[in-house]
């Protein structure tokens, strides 16, 4: 970062200027070259970048779209050597010079002026090196900086084969493609995962700087930990909302911290500029290169920050300055933040809750500013296989889709990478809570001293770096370590199980937990993404948190759930879904659209079982460096096929590309319906004994063009899933629950409002021509409802056998809700509408009719009008051509004959003209079965 040359000296001594004489050179300037001995090539390079990107830019790699698993030549060590950097003769005149690297991926040897100045071995750490003396003795006319990157797969293998490498029972560690990822601190999915490629890139993936201070009193800010919490707040206990706000600021600096420093702060509304508070920080301390101070915001009430759908995202700019004994500013930094408390409640169910009908056990839900809320969202993976391609504009489009989809929380999955600050900034602005995790996933990890020391530095840096963001919701130790890896090692080595539990606790509880709590009081920590919670916490104990593990009681509920079932015969059997307090992962994979496949695959390969398409399906992963493991990939293709054939019309079009497109769409229908069934089930749990308060499906978006669990494709196009999730994440919904074995049908209204809501549910039976069924098939036409705050209520139940539709294959029940209530923090009542549907047979068995859809575009309103003229249109689907990123305001809906629906299209990137508008199409389930 560049030091901001702004001061707040008026707080102390108006006449004194800041200490000057600092020069920061951003190394993102042109002039770098990349050389690879393995490829015997030298090409222009960039910083930030990764070697694959530079080789692609130079034409060494013909097309990024054709990359399947890896390039043999790029498995070799690669080097990065810049052109000579003429930094100017003033460099030698400065008192001190440092090299600062915000992120190097991963193993490097760094040379400056022909001298080795250091090495790095952790992708997630910030590194800095004092090169003052090296520069003064430099004999080069223009100092040359060279960074040599080693091959992460080769180094991981070398560590694994070393004499002191820890070993685990056979069959426990999960190799996706490259082995031994658990030995190194690099993005774990770079070695392959079931939703992405294994490129194992190398390069300077974040910015780098040369920092020079001419004045020895000047400091450079490396990192800032800004912690805002209620007085008396402790991480794992609910904060007292009546207490004053505490602002604790800690700055990590380069340079010599002056004796007796003071600190000042100014807090301004980020939008109006109105000053909330300003003055000196108290209890200023110096520890190593960190300066820390604290203040209490007494007598002032900042505007609170709320997640999407719960209120405003009020933000404040906090300027923190360090002063020397002459009251001169020697370091200054500004961070944008918000005032909120976020708390993961894992405490035991209280007597009051038991009296309300909540089942015994322990809570597992989030509370924002003291209020329980329903977490609606998904899991976010790395948006690209190469982080330098992830830009602010790209992430803004993605997060706009998140908020448009009625989501308020994303789980930042481990093991990708810790998110950039600009991504947290966007989440702050848009009200998206980010459940964040340390980068450990689906593996057991070493616990030797060197590994733990490396991890400790990684944890401290990243906790401090992102702590000021109000969107930060949680720190979790890793992905599925407790729920997947410990059971696996227990089965593999029952006698040695205690050893591995001890190692788990050593890393995630004895090491990471205290480091988190030492650097923040505002965020809760959980050792694993999926857990039964804890029994008790004693921060002075060697193992400060005692996990519950399997110490559970029948009839009680604990923790969160993680659920995948690829047996498609039970996909819609909600008795198979887990009953818990919170669902953090669940899902099924589907194909991307034809338009997305065309970005990456040659036209000749556009059919369902082509080798290119099959091998892009990494469910199931190759299990090693086998680029042609058709057997594993075909299993995933078979699961999607079974999902379609079990429930939907089987596409059989004469045109092969059209048939491929129809099959891709069919897999999306199955995926969307399966997620809808589960989300409805979990949301209904808010009013059940389990008191279920969270649904985060797997996964939000894609990292490349391939069959995955994503709801948003690689370029931003929405699958059917994201439209359906948007609908079923509305504040108040009506949902049918059908036990297709017994025939029992139940209808529930679910609300995530914080106050009771009232309204009416209309039930209308029609046949597939759109005609009303006599007597409404024995169902009442209208039912009033009243649903409690953050709750669910049943409004109707019957057995389908007791109803009177004349032909189950020619019947559909339309459920329409109209209600009123107050949105969270709203002062006026709002109207809510929701529509759902139920068919007493699966879609493949319906007596479908051609709805004869008509589509018109109005250039004045820039909207599309869809009309069904001859029958009920199921899964009405508007599709748009390539060249634009955007989404329709509604999609995947039911349309009765004679009804018109006006729908807008939101353009996120690109532009549209009348030719493009005329290329928009509309289809329905009928078109899936029609042979063209």
From Swiss-Prot:
Q: Which InterPro entries does the record cross-reference, listed alphabetically?
A: Beta-gal/glucu_dom_sf, Beta-mannosidase-like_N2, Beta-mannosidase_GH2, Beta-mannosidase_Ig, Galactose-bd-like_sf, Glyco_hydro_2_Ig-like, Glycoside_hydrolase_SF, Ig-like_fold
Where does this one sit in the cell?
A: Secreted
List, alphabetically, the Pfam families matched: Glyco_hydro_2, Glyco_hydro_2_N2, Ig_mannosidase, Mannosidase_ig
An example GO biological process term is: polysaccharide catabolic process
Q: What molecular function terms (GO) are annotated for this protein?
A: beta-mannosidase activity
Q: What family does this belong to? A: Belongs to the glycosyl hydrolase 2 family. Beta-mannosidase A subfamily.
Q: What does this protein do?
A: Exoglycosidase that cleaves the single beta-linked mannose residue from the non-reducing end of beta-mannosidic oligosaccharides of various complexity and length. Involved in the degradation of polymeric mannan and galactomannan.
Protein's name according to its UniProt entry:
Beta-mannosidase A
Originating organism: Aspergillus clavatus (strain ATCC 1007 / CBS 513.65 / DSM 816 / NCTC 3887 / NRRL 1 / QM 1276 / 107)
